[in-house]
From Swiss-Prot:
One of several proteins that assist in the late maturation steps of the functional core of the 30S ribosomal subunit. Helps release RbfA from mature subunits. May play a role in the assembly of ribosomal proteins into the subunit. Circularly permuted GTPase that catalyzes slow GTP hydrolysis, GTPase activity is stimulated by the 30S ribosomal subunit. Residues 106-274 form the CP-type G domain. Its main location: cytoplasm. PANTHER family: SMALL RIBOSOMAL SUBUNIT BIOGENESIS GTPASE RSGA, SMALL RIBOSOMAL SUBUNIT BIOGENESIS GTPASE RSGA 1, MITOCHONDRIAL-RELATED. The lineage of its organism: Bacteria, Pseudomonadati, Pseudomonadota, Gammaproteobacteria, Pasteurellales. It comes from the Bacteria. This is Small ribosomal subunit biogenesis GTPase RsgA. GO terms for molecular function: GTP binding; GTPase activity; metal ion binding; rRNA binding. It comes from Actinobacillus succinogenes (strain ATCC 55618 / DSM 22257 / CCUG 43843 / 130Z). Binds 1 zinc ion per subunit. Zn(2+) binds at C298, C303, H305, C311. The gene is rsgA.
Amino acid sequence: MAKQKLTQNQKRRIHSNNAKALDRHRRQTKKQIDWQEDMLGETQDGVVVTRYSMHADVENAQGEVFRCNLRRTLAGVVVGDLVIWRQGHEKLQGISGVIEAVKPRKNELSRPDYYDGLKVMASNIDRIIIVSAVLPALSLNIIDRYLVICETANIPPVIVLNKIDLLSAEARQEAEQQLKIYRDIGYRTLMISAETGENMEKLTALLSQGTSIFVGQSGVGKSSLVNQIMPEVNAQTAEISENSGLGQHTTTSSRLYHLPQGGDLIDSPGIREFGLWHLDADQITKGYREFRHFLGACKFRDCKHLNDPQCALREAVEQGKIHPVRFDNYHRLISSKDEAKSQRHFTM
């Protein structure tokens, strides 16, 4: 007998009851750990390296990590946040201190959340590494989806194609041509193999500059890359299901790591679907960087860039100034956004 699916009202009640239970536990914890001024040292700078439901691990200037409570006035503290915190003179129930404030962020990576609206995943990022793979298939549509997120967040992306050791010479040449679409509009691309180590030195050199974060569908080899870059980190490799072709999610929480060669890496749970329903059509359009030069030049202000007469974008495609694959993917994203908005479904 097939398992009956939960209705939306049932899902909301479950979420509400769970939130109430967490809130009760949070309030009980706060009652138990009541930090007084004479129990705390001076304020100091720190960076959040891991965030849990009610606590966060903060690293000080000396590289020591302390588990901290959050002040009641703080909300949405995420990995990468630069914070002001105070260490307790003694540990209380395994808690070493308290985060007092979060410094202004230079940027943040967010995703839409069914219950909470827009949820920030990490902050203060220097580049987003979009990891794709040749198996189960190289999807330029998914790459474009991530690029729209990067452009909207104003975070530079790098497109990395993993598992190239599985490609024949002909397939490799075809993949090169597909990535050339992105190089021609100014994006950096890299073809690597975590299995054989091909071009891994180029990736590690790139990661040595600032803070990076990996994004990509499950099964593209993000955990394998982390293991290759930092063998000491126990990031289990996701195995691709022979039936579905989708990997199992193995990383459970976001964490910031310091790389041996320099730089920082935020390792986050694999993202299978990255919803765009929080963006309107205009934001998605501007998320295609090569479109921007032609925006505002259409005959009609409400041009949908389909069969509208004198559409500047369509004319640019016909003139070879915009790649037709990118233009087709754009319309697919617009259509899927409306469908996803009605369902508001995606998996982490």
